[in-house]
Structure formats: structure tokens, C-alpha cells
Amino acid sequence: MTYPDPTLFGHDPWWLVLAKSLGIFAFLLLTVLAAILIERKVLGRMQLRFGPNRVGPHGLLQSLADGVKLALKEGLVPAGVDKWIYLAAPIISVIPAFMAFAVIPMGGEVSVFGHRTALQLTDLPVAVLYILAVTSIGVYGIVLAGWASGSVYPLLGGLRSSAQVISYEIAMALSFAAVFIYAGTMSTSGIVAAQNDTWYIVLLLPSFLVYVTAMVGETNRAPFDLPEAEGELVGGFHTEYSSLKFAMFMLAEYVNMTTVSALATTLFLGGWHAPWPISIADGANSGWWPLLWFTVKVWLFLFFFMWLRATLPRMRYDQFMALGWKILIPVSLGWIMIVAITHSLRDQGYQAPATAAIGLAVAAVILLALLGRSRLRARRIRPEPIRPAGDGAFPVPPLPVKTRALEDADA
């Protein structure tokens, strides 16, 4: 296998940089078109009904037809909105979604017309933090859309989205810390190279579980789609949007799904490395084959998003916030402490069994502390006395039929 040379980044000819940029853009657009169609097919299969099957053979052109339909719709601007912010919000939401994919490694070094280049647009010493920062900008589009719409429900959806991102981005960043400790770098290509022997999903399983939960919350997908809850907020932050403006919000959502799936592949599933036992074969991790393994792993996470939407109901808002602040963040902090201790002991020459034993002991202590705290809270909570029905309530007036009957009886 051929790992990208960090010195290659920034030295590609302009036409190669342009070609890779267009390739990433086309990859994301095709992934979005396919994901929308496959999601509708999967939901139909899981709900015992037919999915889209009218436009094109077996409904394969349904996503394209929906895009054309949205493009041809009239772009209405409701009265009372802050027009320029209202129009800028979808753009602010969709641009960071594409920008985050610039540092995702999709393969090793390949030859393009005699030029050696990496299947990655660029890389940074803090590439993962760049992704975290850029994806955070996208929430401004949602918040501004809710504020500029001049309506109550979009405003509530925007506020929910901001609280959601603040809550779950902390847990997501903490899950990154364990990867940084093991890899010794924040560069995405360096993290992939560090997983040559063992993928981090094996070594850092709690971090992987925290990240998977947080990435669903970050992308506003079911069961964490509270900013656009149809039963509560009509359509949430994009209630007042139609035509291409609404399509841009949908595009940003699916591109963000692809980005967080690609980041999960990079951090925990070995990136573009071939899975075992395919990796044993000669040439499995060289040439253009890594692009195939990378795409397959990304689609596994996209199917996971679809599976969650089809099977789980939407969470209650207070339960959703409690999951982020009371479970994910404390678990992440405890796990980082364990990873730091075991990694330090390993660097000092202690054997792996001793390190594992210490790690298990620390994990047991943290688990017992959390269980003891929850039991203590359960003891403090006592049931409130049941008030009699109608006590303190407004008296119910008699029905007209009963009133007339009483008057007739008195007469």
C-alpha cells in the first residue's frame, strides 16, 4: 500500500486540484441522489409497502424527477420575513457541508496522467478540528432560517437546532480526543495510516458508540429530528421555505450525513483500508481499490441512518437533552481518562495485560459511581400525593339539557 506523502499536499498542479474538487462535488451529489432513492426504497420495504416505482425503471429516476419538480416550483417569499437573511440561510447551510469533505482521505496515492497525487483534496495538521469547526457553521443557516421566517414554529425549530448542536458537539469532540491520543496526530491521513494494523473501532469501541450517537444528533436525523418535528412544529425551521431553497436544506442534510459517515470511516473503520480478509490479498490497498472500500464503508453508515429512521420513534426533547449531557459527556470524559492512563502506561513499558487490568478497574469504578448516583437520585424522588379530581379546578357548568330538565321539574 502507498500512504500519501504529506509534502504532496499543496503542490498539485492547478488542473489536478480543480479535477479533484469537481470529483468530490460529483461524488457527493451522486451519493445524495442515490441515498434519497434508496432510503425511500428501504423505508417502503421495512413498512411493508412499495417505494417509488413510477419514474424510470423500478423508480430509479425518482430523485432526479423530484429535483426537477423543486426547481420548477415558484419561489415564494412570505410577507413579514427578513428577506436577505431568509434567502441567505439555505446557502449558509449548504456550503459548509461541502467544505468539510475537503480533508477526507478517500484513498492512497495514485497516478493521474503521470502525476502522483493522493485521493484527498488536501490535509491539515488539525484536519479533524477543521471538520468540527466547518460543520458547526452550518447550524447558523438553520438558526437564521428560523429567525428570519417571521413565524413561531420555524423560530422554535432554529432554537432547538442550536441547543442540539451545542449539546452533541461536545460529546463528538470528546470522542475525537481518544483517537488523537492513540494516533498521535489530528491529520486525517495520519489517522488512517495509524490504523494499518488494528482499526480503532476495536481499540476505542466506547468512543465509536458515542460518536455514532452524536453524529445522528448533529445531522438532525430521526430519532433526533426535533428541530423539524412534524407533529410539533409543522416542518420546523424550513416551514416557510419552498422550491430550490427547500431543496438546498435537504441537500445540506444528506451531504452532512455523508460527511459524518466518511469521518466515522476515517476515524474508526480504517479509512480506505480494505477489510479483513480482503486486505491479505496483494494490491487490495493500492491503486484505485481503496476508493471502493471507502465508499462501501460510507454506505454502511448511510444505511444505518435509514434503519434508525424506519424503526425508532422520535425522542422527547427533555430525554434527548438528558442523553447528551448526563450520559454521553460523562461517559466520554471517563473513557478519555482510561485511554490516557493505559496509553501512558504502555509508553512506560508496562505489559499489555497489566494495562488492560488497570483500565478495567478504572472503568468498573466509574461505572459503579454512575450507578450509585442514579440509585441515590431514585431514592430521593418520592411520589407526590394524588390530588382529588376536580380539587381547585374551575367548576364545570351544567349542560343545557340538564338545566332545562331541572327548570321543568321546578315548574
UniProtKB/Swiss-Prot annotation:
Disulfide bond annotation, renumbered to this chain: none
Keyword Transcription applies: no
Keywords assigned: Cell membrane, Membrane, NAD, Quinone, Translocase, Transmembrane, Transmembrane helix
Enzyme class: translocase
GO BP terms in the entry: aerobic respiration
Enzyme Commission no: 7.1.1.-
Transmembrane segments: 18-38, 84-104, 124-144, 165-185, 198-218, 260-280, 288-308, 321-341, 352-372
Entry annotated with the keyword Translocase: yes
A cellular component annotation (GO) from this entry: plasma membrane
InterPro entries in alphabetical order: NADH_UbQ_OxRdtase_su1/FPO, NADH_UbQ_OxRdtase_su1_CS
Subcellular location: Cell membrane
Catalytic activity field: a quinone + NADH + 5 H(+)(in) = a quinol + NAD(+) + 4 H(+)(out)
Membrane topology: Multi-pass membrane protein
Gene Ontology molecular function: NADH dehydrogenase activity; oxidoreductase activity, acting on NAD(P)H, quinone or similar compound as acceptor; quinone binding
Family, per entry: Belongs to the complex I subunit 1 family.
Subunit structure: NDH-1 is composed of 14 different subunits. Subunits NuoA, H, J, K, L, M, N constitute the membrane sector of the complex.
Functional note: NDH-1 shuttles electrons from NADH, via FMN and iron-sulfur (Fe-S) centers, to quinones in the respiratory chain. The immediate electron acceptor for the enzyme in this species is believed to be menaquinone. Couples the redox reaction to proton translocation (for every two electrons transferred, four hydrogen ions are translocated across the cytoplasmic membrane), and thus conserves the redox energy in a proton gradient. This subunit may bind ubiquinone.
Name assigned to this protein: NADH-quinone oxidoreductase subunit H
Organism: Mycolicibacterium vanbaalenii (strain DSM 7251 / JCM 13017 / BCRC 16820 / KCTC 9966 / NRRL B-24157 / PYR-1)
